[in-house]
Amino acid sequence: MTKSEKIIELTNHYGAHNYLPLPIVISEAEGVWVKDPEGNKYMDMLSAYSAVNQGHRHPKIIQALKDQADKVTLVSRAFHSDNLGEWYEKICKLAGKDKALPMNTGAEAVETALKAARRWAYDVKGIEPNKAEIIAFNGNFHGRTMAPVSLSSEAEYQRGYGPLLDGFRKVDFGDVDALKAAINKNTAAVLVEPIQGEAGINIPPEGYLKAIRELCDEHNVLFIADEIQAGLGRSGKLFARDWDNVKPDVYILGKALGGGVFPISVVLADKEVLDVFTPGSHGSTFGGNPLACAASIAALDVIVDEDLPGRSLELGDYFKEQLKQIDHPSIKEVRGRGLFIGVELNESARPYCEALKEEGLLCKETHDTVIRFAPPLIITKEELDLALEKIRHVFQ
């Protein structure tokens, strides 16, 4: 039995089986490359679901984390830490918002945004108590906690978890008329992924985000953009909302915000929204901790200084066009923006992901029939060409 096999056996024995990973153990990583305990080398085309946009172990981010670890790691929010204010300023200026509220995981940030929207609905908009509604979209993925599960349209995400939470409506993604019909006097917010990731890299129709913005303005409803997976350069723009040139009332960010080395997420909005929180009304012991802020400051610097959105746009266009040229009866569609690309098949994508692993390329199926390609944004054209060579070989 190999070391990898022993690790997988141990993991399966003691761990809950809430994931079905490919049978590979990653023990080392740098840039776009990872290794297993046996020394086999693989190219990472998933980026930990876009949490590693800056590449594995980016030296600037790692150094920032090490330097901070030598000073102070956690103070809780009972006291001030010396880099939280700096991080607040950087992320607020980047997003063009007045205020930020840090959490740890994407799901926590979604929960925070939903709480903010409900309290805003009662305290600012004047909706009758306990009547506020939030509209989401079929195919959405906003996390695994109870509120995101309650607004999901996937039966398996909800099975056995009832009773689900009330106050959510769902409409079809891309259908302006359905959204218009769903909005009423009790609508507090519309929660949308500018690109639906887990649903299979679903791109909205042109002008759809603008239509959402206009409807929200017309009815005094908050436009909440979940940019956890598609944001911070992944789509070829700093934020995926930039494709429609709209400005949401609320941003939710996570994943690459921590540079792949420390979890941090955030809700960003103007004072009118985030000032609904008062001391004691919401919090997180680890939210905005010194280690997370240090890693995030460096992670954001890397995104801007190395122009990762621009790299993603240029290389993503090239990669997508090359994928479209692969002639195979199983390939139904190639779609995406930047280095956020889905190859939809007429059959299950899992066997193809397993075959690509054997070729030294790591990716993961989503929505059963879609292969998601989302490499670190630092990838080179030469590395993409190597990936394309392996992909063509599998489809031959």
Swiss-Prot record:
GO terms for molecular function: identical protein binding; ornithine aminotransferase activity; pyridoxal phosphate binding. Pathway: Amino-acid biosynthesis; L-proline biosynthesis; L-glutamate 5-semialdehyde from L-ornithine: step 1/1. It holds the Pfam family Aminotran_3. SUPFAM superfamilies: PLP-dependent transferases. The keyword Amino-acid biosynthesis applies. Disulfide bonds: none annotated. Its cofactor is pyridoxal 5'-phosphate. GO terms for cellular component: cytoplasm. Keywords: Amino-acid biosynthesis, Aminotransferase, Cytoplasm, Proline biosynthesis, Pyridoxal phosphate, Transferase. The modification N6-(pyridoxal phosphate)lysine is found at K255. One of its GO terms (biological process) is L-proline biosynthetic process. It comes from the Bacteria. InterPro entries: Aminotrans_3, Aminotrans_3_PPA_site, Class-III_PLP-dep_AT, Orn_aminotrans, Ornith_aminotrans_bact, PyrdxlP-dep_Trfase, PyrdxlP-dep_Trfase_major, PyrdxlP-dep_Trfase_small. It is found in: Cytoplasm. It catalyses: a 2-oxocarboxylate + L-ornithine = L-glutamate 5-semialdehyde + an L-alpha-amino acid. Its main location: cytoplasm. The keyword Calcium does not apply. Its EC number is 2.6.1.13. Catalyzes the interconversion of ornithine to glutamate semialdehyde. NCBIfam families: Orn_aminotrans (TIGR01885), PRK01278.1 (NF002325), PRK04073.1 (NF003145). HAMAP family: Ornith_aminotrans_3. PANTHER family: AMINOTRANSFERASE CLASS III (PTHR11986), ORNITHINE AMINOTRANSFERASE, MITOCHONDRIAL (PTHR11986:SF18). Belongs to the class-III pyridoxal-phosphate-dependent aminotransferase family. OAT subfamily. This is Ornithine aminotransferase 2. It comes from Staphylococcus aureus (strain MRSA252). The lineage of its organism: Bacteria, Bacillati, Bacillota, Bacilli, Bacillales.
